[in-house]
Amino acid sequence: MDINEIMKILPHRFPFLMVDRIVEMEPGKRCVGLKNVTINEPFFQGHFPGHPVMPGVLIVEAMAQVAGIMAYLASDDETRKKVSYFMAIDNAKFRKPVFPGDQLRIEVETIFSRRGIWSVAGKAYVDGVLATEAELKATFAEKAK
């Protein structure tokens, strides 16, 4: 799935769109996305000058966006009219810094999906090395007016 297809699903736009491509998909079960991290990312201006490091919370956000795509594709037409909202982040661990030039491989796997709540395990890798992991919960709700 390319960026144009991703933008039809996710409401996020620059500078907060954190997924460039979906490379593997089992709707409702598992999804793998890529994020190419470049020095042009606006967050590098302040995190940190002279030593740019991608903020860990944005890596977790990238996981949430990949999970959102997976959940959307597994949902019915009525749910697809809604927007997904974060509910919880548990057991987040930041194991390796992510730098400009890195490519994040973001893997999410469903733990459960019940009563409109999705729980997923997310992992982000750089060159096959685990950089970040977390468990995320989200739900779909009506768009704010």
UniProtKB/Swiss-Prot annotation:
It catalyses: a (3R)-hydroxyacyl-[ACP] = a (2E)-enoyl-[ACP] + H2O. NCBIfam families: fabZ, PRK00006.1. GO terms for cellular component: cytoplasm; membrane. It is an enzyme of class 4 (lyase). This is 3-hydroxyacyl-[acyl-carrier-protein] dehydratase FabZ. The keyword Lipid metabolism applies. GO terms for biological process: fatty acid biosynthetic process; lipid A biosynthetic process. Gene3D superfamilies: Hotdog Thioesterase. It comes from the Bacteria. Involved in unsaturated fatty acids biosynthesis. Catalyzes the dehydration of short chain beta-hydroxyacyl-ACPs and long chain saturated and unsaturated beta-hydroxyacyl-ACPs. It is found in: Cytoplasm. PANTHER family: 3-HYDROXYACYL-[ACYL-CARRIER-PROTEIN] DEHYDRATASE. Keywords: Cytoplasm, Lipid A biosynthesis, Lipid biosynthesis, Lipid metabolism, Lyase. Pfam families: FabA. One of its GO terms (molecular function) is (3R)-hydroxyacyl-[acyl-carrier-protein] dehydratase activity. Belongs to the thioester dehydratase family. FabZ subfamily. Its EC number is 4.2.1.59. The active site is at 47. It comes from Geotalea uraniireducens (strain Rf4).
